[in-house]
Amino acid sequence: MKMSKEKGSQFLLAEYVNNQSVWLNSQILKSSVQLLNEINDELVIEWISPLKQNDYREYRDNFLNVLGVSGAIPNDIWPKRGPVWDGLAKAKGNSGEEIILLVEAKAHLSEMKSELRATSLDSVIVIRKTFQKFRQRNGIDEKYADVWENCYYQLANRLIYLDYLNHTLNIKTYLVLINFVDDNTHVKTSLQDYLSHYKKVFHEMGISHLNLLNYVILCYI
């Protein structure tokens, strides 16, 4: 998939990745003590998408191949036509292992609202079963199920991928949520609004206690 907008989060992410990547990388690293400790001394983050030379292409089911990492998300965990990633990047760990960064960009709060839109009953069954197993395994009450499906579905499915990559495929993975503060290309959102919103989202999803959040990087630009 290709970026088409010339405003908002997609546009801003592409601008930073292609024109200010060193600065962008520093903002990501300073937002996560854990990643800073795990990345090697060169502190290099290599961006795979969205790149100008690739027409700002975004990737979907083949994202691991694009990152040069072996493995796949099986269809009994998530159906085909899974998440489209705003950005992909990778780095080397202290022992030479691959670290991958799955990136989502936001420029205003309404971008964070999402709901399950799968039309195939088989797909819906797989998604709900995967969500339910994740919640049970992590001590999350089923009273939050509706919020996962109808309010913050995008974040919920990103957490599934983050968990599977780290704990089943043993691929060191971070979910980087890049938030553009006071975006002057579209809709302005203050830092305080972002902070309050994420606190509210984590509470409403019942995930405030998750150790997996150590692999979620909230970056404000």
Indicate residue ranges for each PLM-predicted region.
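Short, solvent-exposed loop/turn segments that connect beta-strands within catalytic domains
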Residues: 93-98, 168
